[in-house]
């Protein structure tokens, strides 16, 4: 991202936006310059958004921030506000999915169902319920 501010304005529905950023910025640990500066935007539930920019400008960092997977303070410094349906990204973790740029680098197991189960395990889903959730999740995206 550049220093240019992205602005969508207030929610027309009056509801809490799915994603809301106000002056959000992020600097990776060990870097002098922030990769994200003063990002302001609202994304409504169901809205489709294209995030476009040159390599290295912060697209993946913004998406990782929204998904709540940027790490702790030792990994970098966030400024401003970023909310997912009114909650911090860390407290909303699991409500937002993130597909990485290289799909091969994000699969660990030989079977996709095992990777889906891994996510459920990390969210604390009861072991007896994981199989049902894995099947339901794979059905939603047309995998069996």
Task: Please place each PLM-identified region on the residue numbering.
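The feature captures the beta-strand-to-loop junction immediately N-terminal to the Walker
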Residues: 52-54
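Conserved ABC transporter NBD signature motif
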Residues: 75-94
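Conserved ABC ATPase "signature" region
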Residues: 128-144
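A short, flexible loop at the N-terminus of ABC-type nucleotide-binding domains that lies
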Residues: 9-38, 70-75, 88, 127
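Short helical segment in ABC ATPase nucleotide-binding domains corresponding to the A-loop/adjacent helical element
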Residues: 104, 113-121, 131, 135
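Conserved hydrophobic segment flanking the Walker A/P-loop of ABC-type ATPase nucleotide-binding domains
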Residues: 43-45, 91
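ABC nucleotide-binding domain signature
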Residues: 50, 90, 94-104, 110, ...
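Helix-to-loop junction immediately C-terminal to a conserved catalytic motif
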Residues: 67
């Amino acid at each position: 991202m550049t220093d240019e501010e992205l602005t969508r304005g207030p929610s027309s529905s009056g509801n809490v936006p799915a994603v809301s950023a106000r002056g959000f910025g992020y600097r990776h640990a060990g870097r002098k310059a922030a990769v994200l500066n003063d990002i302001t935007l609202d994304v409504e539930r169901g809205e489709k958004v294209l995030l476009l920019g040159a390599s290295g400008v912060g697209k993946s960092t913004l998406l990782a921030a929204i998904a709540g997977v940027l790490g702790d303070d030792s990994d970098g410094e966030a400024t401003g506000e970023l909310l997912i349906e009114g909650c911090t990204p860390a407290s909303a973790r699991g409500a937002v999915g993130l597909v990485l740029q290289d799909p091969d680098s994000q699969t660990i197991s030989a079977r996709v169902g095992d990777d889906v189960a891994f996510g459920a395990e990390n969210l604390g889903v009861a072991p007896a319920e994981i199989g049902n959730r894995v099947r339901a999740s794979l059905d939603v995206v047309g995998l069996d």
